[in-house]
Swiss-Prot record:
Cross-referenced InterPro entries: RNA_methyltr_RlmE, RNA_MeTrfase_FtsJ_dom, rRNA-MeTfrase_E, SAM-dependent_MTases_sf
Binding positions for S-adenosyl-L-methionine per the UniProt entry: G64, W66, D97, D113, D138
Protein name: Ribosomal RNA large subunit methyltransferase E
Catalytic reactions on record: uridine(2552) in 23S rRNA + S-adenosyl-L-methionine = 2'-O-methyluridine(2552) in 23S rRNA + S-adenosyl-L-homocysteine + H(+)
Taxonomy of the source species: Bacteria, Pseudomonadati, Pseudomonadota, Betaproteobacteria, Burkholderiales
GO CC terms of this entry: cytoplasm
Main subcellular localisation: cytoplasm
Top-level taxon in the UniProt lineage: Bacteria
Enzyme class, spelled out: transferase
EC number per UniProt: 2.1.1.166
Length: 224
């Protein structure tokens, strides 16, 4: 007699939720690679961050859904042409991730570890002297299940994203950064408040209710 394990039950429940998720269905219909596109879309529509003609850096970009959304924002007349929107691109997108993903027309992709100084140097070279209007970060570490260790890993990625933004953003630029509620969250909010003139915590509707995932948006760098 076979007994179903708890993990199998959990996996089946997750799969059922995923299949029936309205954002998963919408992503499939509209040609996005992942439902995550709607998280950035909701943040952008609420705050008006992304505009044609900008330079945007997408950190933790794989599988490319956020870059797809950015691509469509920079070519709005081509929004219905599929995942890798075609047409004239009014803006620049530089994407970075440890994992590779299928190319998106007009998106410059750098594969590498954000912790690696050589990779950061390559990213800085790609940006050049123009500076960046918006940095979006969907980076998340591989979680171990050990709360203290996971909190430290999450905090490090957020701190690195803030440091990168301080180096490359225009004074009125913005940083969108994924964080998680739990140990260390209040310290990350304080970090944003120290570095940005306006700080907006947002949990998009596309973020699952059961998830501790949320986003911090910092707008306008403070003078240091």
């Amino acid at each position: 007699m076979k007994v179903k394990t708890k993990s199998k039950k959990v996996n089946k429940a997750w799969l059922n939720d995923h299949i029936n998720d309205p954002y998963v269905k919408l992503a499939q219909k509209e040609g996005y690679r992942a439902r995550a596109a709607y998280k950035l879309k909701e943040i952008d529509e609420a705050l008006g961050l992304i505009k044609p003609g900008q330079v945007v850096v997408d950190l933790g970009a794989a599988p490319g859904a956020w870059s797809q959304y950015l691509r469509r924002r920079f070519a709005p007349k081509e929004a219905g042409t599929g995942g890798a929107a075609a047409g004239a691109l009014n803006g620049r997108i530089i994407a970075l991730d440890l994992l590779d993903f299928e190319p998106i027309e007009g998106v410059q992709f750098i594969q590498g570890d954000f912790h690696d100084e050589a990779v950061l140097a390559e990213l800085s070279a790609a940006i050049g002297g123009r500076g960046v209007d918006v940095v979006v970060s969907d980076m998340a570490p591989n979680l171990s299940g050990i709360a203290s260790s996971d909190s430290a890993r999450i905090a490090l990625l957020v701190e690195l994203a803030v440091e990168f933004a301080e180096t490359h953003l225009h004074p009125h630029g913005a940083l969108v950064c994924k964080v998680f509620h739990g140990s260390g969250h209040s310290q990350l909010v304080e970090l944003f408040k120290k570095r940005f003139r306006v700080v907006k915590p947002i949990k998009p509707k596309a973020s699952r209710d059961k998830s501790s995932e949320t986003f911090l948006v910092g707008i306008g760098l403070k003078s240091r």
